[in-house]
């Protein structure tokens, strides 16, 4: 939300070049010092016992080829591709979509900030549920919240109703798209986790993000409005929610 506010004010004051410059200065002057301060390598010899324990348990699980031949892998991938596709599209086109709904640019920026509020709340809430509910369908309430939010977006016409719609999209989509690592670990273990997770990244980040941005723009140009694009986003969220019913229970014992 703060980034959106800073970006909007910078855009109004100095144009898009000035806004990018402000973001660059903040990245260099704020983010990098925080990284240097908060993230440090442990002292030599620290955590040897813990590292040994991890090494012993890391051998359990599927190999990468075994995971790729599993239906569970492709279900996780498909679910995440759909969720990230919608979220990236809204992040990129959210302000003009809201302006088309009748909001001013300032109101649209404020409403879109609800997306990040929902995403921030979704992560600890989803983590809390994952620790207590041993089923991949634990993400279903979040998926349904995202569907409800997108449907509400289609009919909302006031700043408050659109803020709530965007909040539900952020809460649901953020929770659903934040389960990738956990689901892969539960289905396939830690034996080849890096390779398995890395093989999903090109689809969820490269394909979904670029496709979400491009396709919404293409649909806008063809339809001269975002109406068709919004229905596509609703369909994608709905398909992602339905895919959760096909997820198998976690294996009782990993290979």
Model-derived features with residue positions:
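Small-residue-rich segments within alpha-helical transmembrane domains of MFS-like 12-TM solute carriers
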Residues: 1, 84, 88, 170-178, ...
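Interfacial helix-cap and linker-helix signal at transmembrane-aqueous boundaries
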Residues: 4-14, 98-99, 129-130, 215-224
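Symmetry-related core transmembrane helices of the 12-TM Major Facilitator Superfamily/SLC fold
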Residues: 18-37, 229-246
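Residue-level signature of the transmembrane alpha-helical cores
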Residues: 23-26, 79, 139-149, 165, ...
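Flexible cytoplasmic inter-helical loops of multi-pass small-molecule transporters
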Residues: 39-62, 254-255
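Extracytoplasmic gate region of multi-pass secondary transporters
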Residues: 65-124, 212
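C-terminal transmembrane helical hairpin of 12-TM major facilitator-type secondary transporters
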Residues: 112-183
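A late C-terminal transmembrane helix in Major Facilitator Superfamily
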Residues: 187-223
């Amino acid at each position: 939300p703060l980034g959106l506010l800073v970006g909007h004010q910078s855009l109004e004051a100095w144009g898009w070049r000035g806004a990018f410059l402000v973001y660059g200065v903040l990245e260099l002057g704020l983010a990098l010092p925080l990284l240097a301060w908060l993230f440090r390598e442990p002292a030599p010899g620290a955590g040897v016992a813990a590292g040994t324990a991890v090494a012993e348990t890391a051998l359990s699980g599927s190999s990468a080829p075994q995971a790729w031949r599993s239906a569970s892998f492709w279900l996780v991938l498909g679910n995440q591709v759909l969720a990230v596709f919608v979220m990236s599209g809204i992040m990129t086109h959210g302000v003009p979509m809201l302006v088309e709904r009748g909001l001013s640019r300032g109101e649209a920026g404020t409403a879109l900030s609800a997306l990040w509020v929902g995403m921030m709340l979704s992560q600890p809430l989803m983590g809390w549920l994952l620790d207590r509910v041993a089923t991949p369908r634990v993400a279903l309430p979040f998926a349904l919240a995202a569907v409800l939010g997108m449907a509400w977006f289609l009919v909302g016409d006031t700043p408050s109703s659109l803020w709530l719609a965007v909040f539900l999209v952020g809460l649901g989509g953020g929770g659903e798209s934040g389960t990738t690592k956990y689901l892969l670990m539960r289905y396939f273990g830690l034996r080849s986790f890096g390779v398995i997770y890395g093989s999903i990244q090109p689809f969820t980040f490269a394909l979904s993000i670029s496709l979400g941005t491009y396709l919404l723009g293409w649909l806008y140009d063809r339809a001269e409005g975002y109406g068709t694009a919004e229905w596509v986003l609703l369909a994608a969220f709905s398909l992602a929610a339905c895919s959760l019913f096909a997820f198998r229970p976690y294996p009782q014992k990993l290979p």
